[in-house]
């Protein structure tokens, strides 16, 4: 199993090198050279497996034999032992043919834990085997940062620096990043929005001198292992609803396109998914793109679902690569247009192919609040704002097959928005009860590449 860049000008890498690299040196994103395939009989044989066993079955083909089976099994079991639900990602019925896939039972109450707990252990294992250290830099619109810090805190082979938009994350999200006492954790509040943070991250990866000097690695969903780990819960939920003999559809709250691309990967691997529905908030670039065929950025609008307040969806590049029949030159042309003018037009055949796999819709803040209220009244189920956006869109896209809405965060991560909508104040689980009283530790920096690189260089052990 080898991994190739979406831009076609970086060397193909094995699994271990691909996850340590994060972003390819040509600015592209790594994808498998070919998709593993499971037959219907293979998928039937997965029925009844516990979540860790299912993860081992689904993910092993991606390793290319680079991690010994007993080691990988141990890392997977350790990762999912951190979750506080026996099913890891349980499925809850909220309507006649509607289900919420609860992805928020991990240490930081967000779906990012599902991938991050495994990624941290995989990276730690590879670095230890090689006797190396790495500097992790990540950008977050809220949940990625807390999940990454929890997963990497105290690990001897990595220092982690998380960039988040100053004043644009929820209080719970901020404290999950700023209250760690681990010496290898650095929270950086950037004066700007998430796209500024993500732009700094990409610029650091594209500064090859800096990248090599600090042994830079990334844990954003540009890292293939993040996408890979998320494929598993598409299999687990579909199996619960009768796959492979019964198709299912999924609606996914979408910002950076990583979570829904994992669903696309599951479909490429043989899972019978009828529709993949993209749900956006007021920052609706993906819904507009599917409607018009033109990807055009606008300003970012702050909403009650901040993890979706994004205009540059990094993982959309992976879909462009697939839709163009893996024509890296086409992807490079699109990305050049995005950099030069903030826009590009997708070829007619390619957008038609995308529309055959995906639907897209949006929910504004009033619709999100109304959906939180109605779901509580009708189903006695409390949604966070991101899941509510998906639930609103899912209602418009309902069909004959079961619709699984991805529940991406616990409502207590967004108490102000949830209480304003429903009148109910969601409480943090007891085991996180002290979070809001812990002392914070973070540094405010301008959106300036040199200042951020200097800060990282002075503190990264790999640079010494």
Predicted regions and their residues:
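PLP-dependent amino-acid enzyme catalytic core
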Residues: 1-464
């Amino acid at each position: 199993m080898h991994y190739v860049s979406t831009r076609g000008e970086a060397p193909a890498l094995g699994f271990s090198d691909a996850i340590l690299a994060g972003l390819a040196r040509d600015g592209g994103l790594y994808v498998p050279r070919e998709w593993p395939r499971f037959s219907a009989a293979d998928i039937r044989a997965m029925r009844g497996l516990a979540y860790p066993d299912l993860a081992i079955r689904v993910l092993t083909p991606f390793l290319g034999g680079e991690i010994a089976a007993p080691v990988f099994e141990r890392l997977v079991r350790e990762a999912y032992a951190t979750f506080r639900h026996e099913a890891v990602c349980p499925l809850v019925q909220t309507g006649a043919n509607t289900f919420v896939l609860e992805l928020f039972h991990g240490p930081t109450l967000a779906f990012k834990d599902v991938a991050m707990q495994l990624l941290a252990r995989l990276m730690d294992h590879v670095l230890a085997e090689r006797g190396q250290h790495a500097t992790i830099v990540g950008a977050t619109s809220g949940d990625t940062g807390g999940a990454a810090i929890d997963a990497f805190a105290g690990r001897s082979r990595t220092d982690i620096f998380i960039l988040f938009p100053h004043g644009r994350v929820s209080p719970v999200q901020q404290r999950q990043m700023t209250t760690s006492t681990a010496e290898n954790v650095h929270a950086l509040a950037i004066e700007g929005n998430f796209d500024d943070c993500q732009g700094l991250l990409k610029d650091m990866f594209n500064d090859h001198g800096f990248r090599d000097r600090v042994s830079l690695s990334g844990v954003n969903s540009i890292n293939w292992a993040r996408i890979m780990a998320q494929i598993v819960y598409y299999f687990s939920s579909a199996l619960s609803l009768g796959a492979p003999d019964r198709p299912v559809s999924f609606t996914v709250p979408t910002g950076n396109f990583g979570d829904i691309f994992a669903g696309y990967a599951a479909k490429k691997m043989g899972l019978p998914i009828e529709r993949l529905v993209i749900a956006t908030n007021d920052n609706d670039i993906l819904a507009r793109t599917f409607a018009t065929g033109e990807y055009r950025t606008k300003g970012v609008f702050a909403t009650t679902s901040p993890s979706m307040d994004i205009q540059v969806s990094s993982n959309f590049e992976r879909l462009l690569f697939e839709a163009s029949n893996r024509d890296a030159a086409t992807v490079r042309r699109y990305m050049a247009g995005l950099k030069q003018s903030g826009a590009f037009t997708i070829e007619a055949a390619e957008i038609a192919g995308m529309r055959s796999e995906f639907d897209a819709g949006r929910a504004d803040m009033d619709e999100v609040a109304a959906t939180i209220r109605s779901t509580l009244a009708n189903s006695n189920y409390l949604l966070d704002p991101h899941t509510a956006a998906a639930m609103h869109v899912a209602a418009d896209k309902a069909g004959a097959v079961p619709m699984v809405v991805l529940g991406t965060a616990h409502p207590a991560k967004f108490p102000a928005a949830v209480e304003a909508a429903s009148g109910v104040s969601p409480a943090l689980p007891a085991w996180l009860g002290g979070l809001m009283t812990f002392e914070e530790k973070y540094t405010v920096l301008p959106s300036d590449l040199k200042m951020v690189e200097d800060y990282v260089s002075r503190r990264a052990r790999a640079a010494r």
